[in-house]
């Protein structure tokens, strides 16, 4: 196993970061729970580096005195929950963007979107967004509320298409979203 690159374990489906640690935001909470509840025996996958060993041990050791299911505690969202919340946020933000933004507002929004694509908690999702944004014609359109709404919709459609979900009519969506914000 080579560290320094993010990857998904084919057996467990868990996504690991470049240091060999599970990406908590990218993985569904139940996946961590299942791995953590594995007995500390020969059924645990072979470990090929100290970093991987420490990672697997800490995930197991942290859960030996697990909190009962009846106790509520904060948790990170799984990737699907994170995605739904993110699209709600981005569509709402675009719908509330000024109809005629100043050059400063345009610059701020463009910077936000580029930075957002660098720091989004799901690294593979962030990378997909950066790749999409780098394609010709896909840089953020921030010259008006309607153009930003349409751009967010197109980005959302790119994700929906890869996931096999229905696509939005972005021209209709951007007009409706802009009207709702007024």
From Swiss-Prot:
One of its GO terms (biological process) is mitochondrial disulfide relay system. Keywords: Disulfide bond, FAD, Flavoprotein, Mitochondrion, Oxidoreductase. It catalyses: 2 R'C(R)SH + O2 = R'C(R)S-S(R)CR' + H2O2. It is found in: Mitochondrion intermembrane space. InterPro entries: ALR/ERV, ERV/ALR_sulphydryl_oxid_sf, ERV/ALR_sulphydryl_oxidase. Its main location: mitochondrion. One of its GO terms (molecular function) is flavin adenine dinucleotide binding. One of its GO terms (cellular component) is mitochondrial intermembrane space. The keyword Nucleotide-binding does not apply. Its EC number is 1.8.3.2. Signal peptide: none annotated. FAD-dependent sulfhydryl oxidase that catalyzes disulfide bond formation. Required for the import and folding of small cysteine-containing proteins in the mitochondrial intermembrane space (IMS). This is Mitochondrial FAD-linked sulfhydryl oxidase erv1. It comes from Schizosaccharomyces pombe (strain 972 / ATCC 24843) (Fission yeast).
């Amino acid at each position: 196993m080579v560290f320094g690159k993010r990857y998904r374990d084919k057996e467990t489906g868990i996504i690991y970061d470049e240091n060999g640690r599970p990406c908590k935001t990218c993985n569904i909470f139940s996946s961590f729970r299942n791995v953590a509840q594995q007995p500390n025996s020969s059924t645990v996958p072979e470990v090929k580096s100290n970093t991987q060993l420490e990672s697997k041990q800490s995930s197991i050791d942290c859960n030996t005195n697990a909190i009962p299911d009846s106790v509520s505690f904060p948790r990170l969202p799984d990737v699907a929950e994170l995605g739904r919340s993110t699209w709600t946020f981005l569509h709402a933000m675009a719908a509330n963007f000024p109809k005629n933004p100043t050059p400063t507002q345009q610059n701020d929004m463009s910077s936000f979107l580029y930075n957002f694509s660098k720091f989004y908690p799901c690294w593979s999702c962030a990378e997909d967004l950066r790749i999409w944004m780098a394609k010709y014609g896909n840089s953020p359109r921030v010259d008006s509320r309607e153009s930003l709404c349409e751009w967010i919709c197109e980005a959302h459609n790119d994700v929906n298409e890869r996931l096999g979900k229905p696509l939005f009519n972005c021209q209709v969506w951007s007009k409706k979203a802009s009207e709702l914000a007024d």
